[in-house]
Amino acid sequence: MQKLINIFRKIQGLLSAPLHRIANYTRLRGSNFNITFKHEGCVDVKLPKLSIINAVFGSGINFSRNVSYMSRPNAEVLLRKLIFEMYKSGYINKNLSIVDIGSWISDNSIVWASYLSGSGHVLAIDPSSDNLKYSKNLANINNIKNINFIEAVCSEKPGMKLDFDGTIDHAEFKVSESKNSIESSSIDKIVYEGNYEIGLMHVDVEGFELSVLQGSESVLKRDMPVISFEQHISREDVSKVSNYLKNFGYRVFMVNEVLPFCDKDCRNFLAFPVNKEIPQLTKFNQADAYSLGICSAVVGESLIEI
């Protein structure tokens, strides 16, 4: 009897993954492979179309990334709202460029590109060639011309040898002399070589945020962009990043939001130059936050100064 149960479980295991992929494919097809970022001005993003064969076997670089994309409009809702409002109100100059480092599948880069005008570009920086290949295809499908895709990992200075844990598609970097090490670039190098002026920096680099910001010193001094960064507050010393930014004349705030699809201690932060007023953002009753797709981290305002 136990042998039959074990056989059944193996069959169930073999079938569950493709059935789950087919269910996701059905959702994608039902939306005509179109995702709407309803909290960011209802920006529509067309995804690469797939066949049922792609779903059954999970083949190609597009399927898993398309599935991830489906959830992105409902991830980090408060941060998305805040950045959208800062552009809508003119708090951030639309003619300035955006650094999106750790751009992954470019769910931010693609949307934010629609906010920009004039000479403003998004610099979508990621170490994964597959992530960038997918993202370039997205930009082409959606006729977006103002994103520059850059395959790089950045640290406090160019030429550092780095290794990583995990896969290159979602890596945690560290200094290393291993034979598989990758040579770093820096934000300052990329920005100055391209002659960009920066209005927003979004830094999501899996624990390497301080190193990346240290390699942005010239940009911070010259442009004083708004900065968004992520930290795991139960495992990382947030004061290291916040104190570094305060030394450049920033005020640092935690975004009051628990992030779905992330570890429980993951939080977003926003840093604003002290020579500018804190942006006037739409206020809402915290008791209504959940109905807006926001799960507050603590009782209080949308931004909590640290």
Each model region followed by its residue ranges:
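Hydrophobic packing residues within well-ordered alpha-helices of enzyme cores
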Residues: 112, 135, 212-216, 241
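Conserved SAM-binding strand-loop segment of SAM-dependent methyltransferases
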Residues: 144-152
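Short strand-turn motif at the edge of the Rossmann-like AdoMet-binding core
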Residues: 128, 206, 230-232
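S-adenosyl-L-methionine
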Residues: 1-138, 142, 194, 254, ...
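Proline-aspartate-enriched helix->loop->beta-strand connector
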Residues: 224-229
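Short helix-capping segments at alpha-helix termini
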Residues: 117-118, 140-145, 220-223, 250
